Every structure is written in C-alpha cells, then in structure tokens.
Amino acid sequence: MEDEFVYKEAVAAEVIEVIGRTGVTGGIIQVRCKILGGKDTGRVLVRNVKGPVKVGDIIMLRETEREARPLDRRR
C-alpha cells in the first residue's frame, strides 16, 4: 500500500546527453537532462546518476534545484 506513493514528489526528466563517468570506480554517470514536469518544466540540468542510463531514458528527480559540478577534465 505504501509503494503507491514512492514518486509522489519526484519530477520526471529526460536524458538528452551523457557527459561522462565520475566517481572513484566510474560508477556514477553525469548526464544533461530536461525537466518534463513541475515548476521547472523545460529547464536543462546537469545531474549525477547511479546505474545504467542512456539518451532518451526518463529519470525521476526528487528535486530540481541543484546541479552537479562539472567533471574534472585534467587527466
């Protein structure tokens, strides 16, 4: 019964670009995504995502205020 409201306050976003991998073992993927609903509809954010993701996937974001820091490209 509680599982029905898992995404009650989450907002859908579509992955429009996979930027690269981050994290010690590369387990986090940095993506550019477009917000599909809520007060920030149409806004493009850079976020870090855990798990497999590709362009066109829909991800659920708990909040749309923060953006991920750019990847360090020094290496």
UniProtKB/Swiss-Prot annotation:
SUPFAM superfamilies: Nucleic acid-binding proteins (SSF50249). Coiled coil: none annotated. GO terms for biological process: maturation of SSU-rRNA; ribosomal small subunit assembly; translation. GO terms for cellular component: cytosolic small ribosomal subunit. GO terms for molecular function: structural constituent of ribosome. It comes from the Archaea. Keywords: Ribonucleoprotein, Ribosomal protein. Belongs to the eukaryotic ribosomal protein eS28 family. This is Small ribosomal subunit protein eS28. It comes from Methanocaldococcus jannaschii (strain ATCC 43067 / DSM 2661 / JAL-1 / JCM 10045 / NBRC 100440) (Methanococcus jannaschii).
